[in-house]
Amino acid sequence: MAQVAVSTLPVEEESSSETRMVVTFLVSALESMCKELAKSKAEVACIAVYETDVFVVGTERGCAFVNARTDFQKDFAKYCVAEGLCEVKPPCPVNGMQVHSGETEILRKAVEDYFCFCYGKALGTTVMVPVPYEKMLRDQSAVVVQGLPEGVAFQHPENYDLATLKWILENKAGISFIINRPFLGPESQLGGPGMVTDAERSIVSPSESCGPINVKTEPMEDSGISLKAEAVSVKKESEDPNYYQYNMQGSHPSSTSNEVIEMELPMEDSTPLVPSEEPNEDPEAEVKIEGNTNSSSVTNSAAGVEDLNIVQVTVPDNEKERLSSIEKIKQLREQVNDLFSRKFGEAIGVDFPVKVPYRKITFNPGCVVIDGMPPGVVFKAPGYLEISSMRRILEAAEFIKFTVIRPLPGLELSNVGKRKIDQEGRVFQEKWERAYFFVEVQNIPTCLICKQSMSVSKEYNLRRHYQTNHSKHYDQYMERMRDEKLHELKKGLRKYLLGSSDTECPEQKQVFANPSPTQKSPVQPVEDLAGNLWEKLREKIRSFVAYSIAIDEITDINNTTQLAIFIRGVDENFDVSEELLDTVPMTGTKSGNEIFSRVEKSLKNFCIDWSKLVSVASTGTPAMVDANNGLVTKLKSRVATFCKGAELKSICCIIHPESLCAQKLKMDHVMDVVVKSVNWICSRGLNHSEFTTLLYELDSQYGSLLYYTEIKWLSRGLVLKRFFESLEEIDSFMSSRGKPLPQLSSIDWIRDLAFLVDMTMHLNALNISLQGHSQIVTQMYDLIRAFLAKLCLWETHLTRNNLAHFPTLKLASRNESDGLNYIPKIAELQTEFQKRLSDFKLYESELTLFSSPFSTKIDSVHEELQMEVIDLQCNTVLKTKYDKVGIPEFYKYLWGSYPKYKHHCAKILSMFGSTYICEQLFSIMKLSKTKYCSQLKDSQWDSVLHIAT
């Protein structure tokens, strides 16, 4: 709560300390209401004027707005003072009894309002609901009031003394209402036909209902109607527990008729609000008018509205967030109601949801037992549940179970038949395509994202599927981007249903459908398809604002070295593409000059702009990174020629270092024994069969051993792990075949094997993490940095003989100092990793600026980017979007006022972190280019590989 002193107010005689305390309590209550509204994502700002003080309460943004408008505060204070001067000053009390009575009435009114607010909160709404004091006192178990002072019973505030009222307001945060059994009698329907008028309210006992909330507002500019005091109430329908009606009862002083303006907000009706006849851009809430029985029928004409003093209610743009929150609460109730309906249907033996008779279950305890409800949550209709209770129910959905003990009175379960979906008349609506990414395929709603189909064209089912599975990733697409994504997903569905030929090259559809018998070559359609893809690739490359290349080589079955060139580019919309650019056979020398000439020729074929080349990723061989004649050196020279001042970044593949670092362990004495014994067992069929039988007889956890190959690095860790866990069986089998291995009985050798098992498993985990699809270079760099930190931790633990992260070594350890023997090996691994990451450390500041733009220090940013980065870090809107979507999606929302920073981010996003994509291509090549089809032309192989990738 902010308090602002205004000097323009006349200083009157100071009030008593008790009066000021009362004002403080009331403002505190107003602040509590603002906090509750803020939970519904509503922005509120309130200004209260008392004597010479101005109190500002509300949400954080609301208070910031009012505090920034000091002129608005002063004008409001002057207005309040001017209005007060016009009124007749009441005579001073003769004694202090009248003042004391006035303070008591104010406190009593505040307590009564807070009780109404707590009761409304217990009903699941944020508005104040009149408290049925008489019914609560008659049936004290129906509603429990917690937090009252010890020895003080709940009753109407008019029965409390001044001290009790003050205590309640001071400790109101701990007071809450818990509804165990709702009041469902017809006479208790709030806002029903029996609602009294203002004249009648004056003679009704205060225990019947909470008084109206008086709100003073400025008159509207376009009408002479001023909004007077409004009485807000909530009417609960007995038949449908998910239906609420919010009534605003007019209390115009000059009105003698009982006219009610009733706003209906059904919890399940999804029909959009009907706009008024008067054109207005803002959406309008539907207004239902109820008049006297003696009054004439009300029309929609302007005259009718004028006669009844009805104020049109509009929903401004700044209330969209509040309406969104109401919609979420509505959906939450629908989900709970659907859950209860499905569980009740299962209880009565049907496979579809059945409407739950909440009233019959409540008033007939023992007929239906509900198990699995969260602790402290009582079963009741979703309309009576709090938001937190509904969320807990959904979390425990799989544990909730309905059991019918005996039939419910008046409910014939035998009449519940099979569900006839075809008679429900449901029709798929076109707007669901854009809202939930669903289309109708042969009268069946099908999800465009996961291709899952729904049995019924029901919006709730489609919305629940979308929000449960896809909203996290697809809510970010708005307006035009959402339409483009919908079009893209539709094309993907067509490809999924009809095959890829219609999508990739529609002009060749007949060629694939009806191949000509006169075709001379069976591979001609493949070349035509690839030709179409080459043209698309050229068009895509022209749209790149930055790109990088990755180069690696392999020897195929014909003993020919194949050089693979991949390109990774980013367009102006920050869409990333990775494509195979070319495969070049290296038949001559493999020098840097020869490789450069082949790469240059391939880049010219696609008319690539050298000035947009950002980096090159390679394996780090001398032909690639030689300082004089290496490929990277010549590429840097060429880029500098086309773009002065530009520097080509060179990245050595960081997937291979772990296999190279393994050589630094120098544990060949372990690997040689393992490889020799495993290959001897697995390479001979008889040995392998007998060994498998032995493992089966010994009831071992493995039925065989893995064959070790030096080509596959991952096989080393798997072989070592299985070898260690089958050590006794292998020793017994080798001894029975006359090939004993004395190392298998050596404690030191077994301990070295255990350390190697743990270390290779750690390296394998790193390798798998680095091989993720389409990883950003910053993510891969973070993984390597994390592994370096782990190495430092392991070294520290080994000095203390802490083997917590070496479980296999811990099993084989027999001495408290066994861990000290492997500290030098960990240190060698650290040195090797740091050496191979030296390239990344050169660009560490640029990578950090991309991955953490809002926490980067300005001093570490390049001078040409500093101004834009400062503007970005001070932009709270973009900071919120960054926290919500993260990178790289955040950069799609970056505004055009950051051109230099956007270009910097595009360059970082285009960088390859490794040549793993080349290794994927080589795997495809080994599977495709066998000795049976190795005679195809190079152009034909390019087409096959390009389609495969």
Swiss-Prot record:
Its main location: nucleus. The lineage of its organism: Eukaryota, Metazoa, Chordata, Craniata, Vertebrata. GO terms for molecular function: DNA binding; DNA-binding transcription factor activity, RNA polymerase II-specific. This is General transcription factor II-I repeat domain-containing protein 2A. It comes from the Eukaryota. GO terms for cellular component: nucleus. GTF2I-like repeats lie at residues 98-192, 323-417. Ubiquitous. The keyword Protein biosynthesis does not apply. Belongs to the TFII-I family. It is found in: Nucleus. It is linked to GTF2IRD2 is located in the Williams-Beuren syndrome (WBS) critical region. WBS results from a hemizygous deletion of several genes on chromosome 7q11.23, thought to arise as a consequence of unequal crossing over between highly homologous low-copy repeat sequences flanking the deleted region. The keyword Repeat applies. PROSITE patterns: GTF2I. Keywords: DNA-binding, Nucleus, Repeat, Transcription, Transcription regulation, Williams-Beuren syndrome.
